Every structure is written in C-alpha cells, then in structure tokens.
Amino acid sequence: MKANDSYRLKIGLTLNNLAREMMTYHVGDRIPAITELVERYQVSRGTVQSALAQLCSEAMTLKKSGHLGSYITAINHRKIWEYTGWNTLIGAMPLPSNNSLKGLATALTTSIEYAQLPFNMAFMQSAQNRVNGLLAGRFDFVVVSRLSADVCLEKNPQLTMAVELPRGSYNKSHVIAFSNPKETRLRDGMRVAYDPCSYDQTQLTRLCCEGLNIQYFHMPYRSTLHCLEHGGVDAVIYLKESAARSTHRLGMAPIPYEDPLSKAIYAVLLTSKENY
C-alpha cells in the first residue's frame, strides 16, 4: 500500500470513530482534547486534527475556550451520521404489551426520527434473545430492564449500559399470580412456569421459590400466563398490569423482595463496545 493510501485510510477510520463518538454529544458539551483522542484512537495528532476539521467543515461548530477546551455550539447529527460508516440504526425491545413499553416505544421512535436518522425497531420477547442479537451484531442497541442488564453485563463485558431511563419506564410491577383465586402464597409441591430466556422472570421466580420444593416448567414468557389460566401450572411471576387484564379469576400476591423488584421497572439501553 502506498504511503498516501495508508494515510487516507487512517484519516477515514479516524473520521468514522470520531463521528461515532460525536453522535453522543450535543450543543454545550465539551469535546475531548486532541491528546485524549490521539491516545484513544492510537493515531497521530495530525490525523485527529484532519478528521476533526472535516467534521467541523460540514457537521458541527466548535468554540475554543483556551485551557477549558472546545465546546460544541452547533451540531447536525444527521450529517455526523453520514461519517460513522453505519447504515440503518436498528434497535430491539419487548413487544409493547403494557403502557410503560408503549410509551417507551413511541418516545424512542420519535426521538430518533426527530434526529432524522435511518431507524428500525424490532420487537422481540425475552432479554436473552435481544442480547444475543446485540452480541451477533444484528442490533445496535437493545432495551432490557435494569435487573436484566445487571445479568447481561456480568456475563458479557463487551456490552455497556448506554442509557438508564426513569423509574417505571419498563413496567410498573410484577406479582405472583395463582390459578386459584384464593391462593396468597407459594407452597411446597406447586407447579411454577417461567421462561429461562426472560432474565427478569427467571430471577424473580427463583428468588420467590427459594427453599420450597417446586416443580418447574419452562415455556415462552407469554405462554406462562396462558398455561396458568387453564390450570396447567399453579403459579407464575408476571406483570401485574397484564395479569389484572386476564379474563380468568386469578389470585395475586406481591413479591416480597424490594431490590430486585425495583430494578425490574427501570428500562436500560445496552450497546456493544465492539460496535464503536
């Protein structure tokens, strides 16, 4: 490869990396110092300066404030996107089966479309399936609960939490639902269904059933409630909002574990460090 070609390749790759980083910045933000970017991208100072100059000529404006650094005074994320090397932004989230998820789906779609970015959202049940898609490079981000995120990040250090949304952004609460409307607690010998691919349901089920002699049944998340309604199992951990809409008379009891239960109601966006 000729020297000029090698230099242009370095400029191009640095421009991709810088544009991807700038996608997370907004007006008023201070950008990293040149020396910091040189160390991060492992290229020369001149290469970073050339890439930054290209972005500033077409997509953003900086104000230099001496030793305080440079601040963004204007930025066109749609134009920045053109330099990222990315195509359509693809996210994945659960089916919007409750009011929290319906609102979240609308908010995410509206926000990204407002930025004029090419975008598609895939709706897919179970955090494990969504995270597997993220790890395989099929998705750029996935929506899971904070409870699921903790499990995913421990298992997959290449993932990172990009955004944590407010309380109630994922759902309102889970309950223990019983096929017997008079039942109020889990007991030895009960049949309990859960989806092993649903980190929330799995963790809450195991926690609630700890110390009890329980017969477990594995099935897709949405099938657990259907199975409960028709007497196939005695209990499931399910979203209170969805269980309350059941046309069958079900018993319901609160989950007596505040910490994991509270983490299950926060929505989190996970991304891969290897994608940026």
Which functions belong to the PLM regions below?
Residues 1-33:
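Extreme N-terminal segment that seeds HTH/winged-HTH DNA-binding domains in transcriptional regulators
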Residues 64-77:
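Short, Lys/Arg-rich nucleic-acid/phosphate-binding segment
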Residues 121-132, 215-229:
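Short helix-initiation/N-cap motifs at beta->coil->alpha
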Residues 25-30, 60-61, 139, 233:
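Conserved hydrophobic residue
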Residues 76-78, 163-179, 249-276:
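Periplasmic-binding protein-like
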Residues 30-64:
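N-terminal helix-turn-helix
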Residues 143-156, 226-258:
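A ligand-binding cleft/hinge motif common to bilobed small-molecule-binding domains
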Residues 89-204:
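Mid-protein regulatory/catalytic core that forms ligand/cofactor-binding pockets
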